[in-house]
Amino acid sequence: REPPGGVILDPKGDYGQKIRLLCEKYGRASDLVVIDPFDQRRSIRWNPLDSDDDELELASRFGAVLESLGMSGGENTFWIDAAQRVIRHSISLLRFTNPANEPPSFRDIQSLVSSFAAIADRTDQLDLSNPGVEPCLSFFGEWMDMAPNQRSGIQTHVTNMLDPFLMEPYATAFSGTSTIRIS
């Protein structure tokens, strides 16, 4: 199956019905894929972190979402950039330590951001002979040594970015292995 040609955010559901009718009219109803957290039977599962894109690209998407929501500019830029950085390195750490074919999850990122024990558990699993783990270890060393007020500010931004994905029904719809890859 080809990847979708576009993604439409339709929280109210009224636009989706119009698109469905249009697809049916042109014989393309089978090409329409839907992410509907409230109706898992008709929905695909899509984990935005289940992607071959690098960690920087994935984290940058979250920053772009915050900017589109009007959270950019001025003093927020520092916090958004810092949040993207911790998300990027969290994705990297999860990719190094998750079982094969298990993509990172928002819940695991939140756990790393909020718990030194979770970081220690994951970093203890790293293969230190792999030179790719060094930036990840270095970042989390800085994270643990960071001034508590600064770390708390970053944690707040990350929590605000991830929170919707941690609650049902979104936690199920946007986790695990994706039904199809969108990106």
Where are these regions (language model features)?
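P-loop NTPase motor domains
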Residues: 1-183
